[in-house]
């Protein structure tokens, strides 16, 4: 698994690709998909072709020029800043999943210093990906829920009083 940092426009591209993946799930989840041109859909070359068991899928993004308005460097200006990393899995679509990681345990105060009387916590969103599974010459696809950390927020700590 490879990890790299990702910022603004790349994050938007990831989100758009995720939505695209969800759009074709009703077709792809019900079928075995042989070679379609994208390496995600390719079976081993030694496997015989499956007659009538294919579909064409254009994974290009429609209206890619429409940008989602995002504030610049929101991950650095937050009172609970975070970094973006990308995980790579060739048997998952999308193969790249962006995750946020909180930079601090505490929150950043008005003076720019960490305040440990507050807690920086991850904001998580459950999303669907497509998982490719090989069983001999058979390739199947299955929906998988993944928990993606999309940012961090500052909260008051939970204090338990011992009696």
From Swiss-Prot:
Gene Ontology molecular functions = cytokine activity; cytokine binding; cytokine receptor binding; protein heterodimerization activity; protein homodimerization activity
Q: Which disease is it linked to?
A: Candidiasis, familial, 6: A primary immunodeficiency disorder with altered immune responses and impaired clearance of fungal infections, selective against Candida. It is characterized by persistent and/or recurrent infections of the skin, nails and mucous membranes caused by organisms of the genus Candida, mainly Candida albicans.
* SUPFAM superfamilies in the cross-refs: Cystine-knot cytokines
Q: Name one GO biological process term.
A: defense response to Gram-positive bacterium
The family note in this entry says: Belongs to the IL-17 family.
| Keyword RNA-binding on entry | no
- What is the protein name given in its UniProt record? Interleukin-17F
**Where are glycans found on this sequence?**
83
GO CC annotations, alphabetized:
extracellular region; extracellular space
Q: Which residues form the signal peptide?
A: 1-30
In which tissues does this protein get expressed? Expressed in T-helper 1 and T-helper 2 cells, basophils and mast cells.
Recite the UniProt keywords alphabetically: Adaptive immunity, Cytokine, Disease variant, Disulfide bond, Glycoprotein, Immunity, Inflammatory response, Innate immunity, Secreted, Signal
Entries under InterPro entries matching the protein: Cystine-knot_cytokine, IL-17_chr, IL-17_fam
Q: Which cysteines link up through disulfide bonds?
A: 102-152, 107-154
């Amino acid at each position: 698994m490879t990890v790299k940092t990702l910022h603004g426009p790349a994050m938007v591209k990831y989100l758009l690709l995720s939505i695209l993946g969800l759009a074709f799930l009703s077709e792809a989840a019900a079928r075995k998909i042989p070679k379609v041109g994208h390496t995600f859909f390719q079976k081993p070359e030694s496997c015989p072709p499956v007659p009538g068991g294919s579909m064409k899928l254009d994974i290009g993004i429609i209206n890619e020029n429409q940008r989602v308005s995002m504030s610049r460097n929101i991950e650095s200006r937050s009172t609970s800043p975070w970094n973006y990393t990308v995980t790579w899995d060739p048997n998952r679509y999308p193969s790249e999943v962006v995750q946020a990681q909180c930079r601090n345990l505490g929150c950043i105060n008005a003076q720019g210093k960490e305040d440990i009387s507050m807690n920086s916590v991850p904001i998580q969103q459950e999303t669907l990906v497509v998982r490719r599974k090989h069983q001999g010459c058979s390739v199947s696809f299955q929906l998988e829920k993944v928990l993606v950390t999309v940012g961090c927020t500052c909260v008051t700590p939970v204090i338990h009083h011992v009696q």
